[in-house]
């Protein structure tokens, strides 16, 4: 499969009348979005111009775990944490459950096993950036790609794949949690979202497809979901995560 075939050049913007939108150079774009009376925080990144990184452990091999420790580490390096969100689902040992690539280095391999829980609700998938181009593909498709990502996180299930919702999502599901995920638009924008109220996976998937304009989107996690985004008034610095995905400058 040709990686470039996954990326379309058509430039589109998907902003709803219910969204409050603001942006300034180097800080990404922040929105508060409402869909079906549910509120979400949304943060957009342009990988052509913004530095999106993935973190798990510091150089000493200790897990960052919280936004505070990551922020303090970056500050000591002369860098700024602009935005952060927990990345893909992790194990009880606080290790990424699937593929985890930082700065081009493979730290955890692709997980193609069968199992129980959201991660293994097939199709699951991989979000990655390679040569400043973002993509989300299902795990099987990823094995066929000849690509060397700068960053990658595997999770599951896929919320949206090529414009189609996951076949095992149902509108009347009573599995309600605070949830976070990531999507990619046709113009190579990366879109992160977190719900402010408990929702089901069907509702979350329709947010990415119908309101945020993402033909592909990946579920990151639920119940433990958190966001650090001062531009949205969100300055939570706690957390107990494995992977953390961050906009750094």
Model-derived features with residue positions:
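Bacterial N-terminal signal peptides
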Residues: 16-23
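Conserved, well-ordered active-site substructure
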Residues: 95-113, 168-216, 225-249
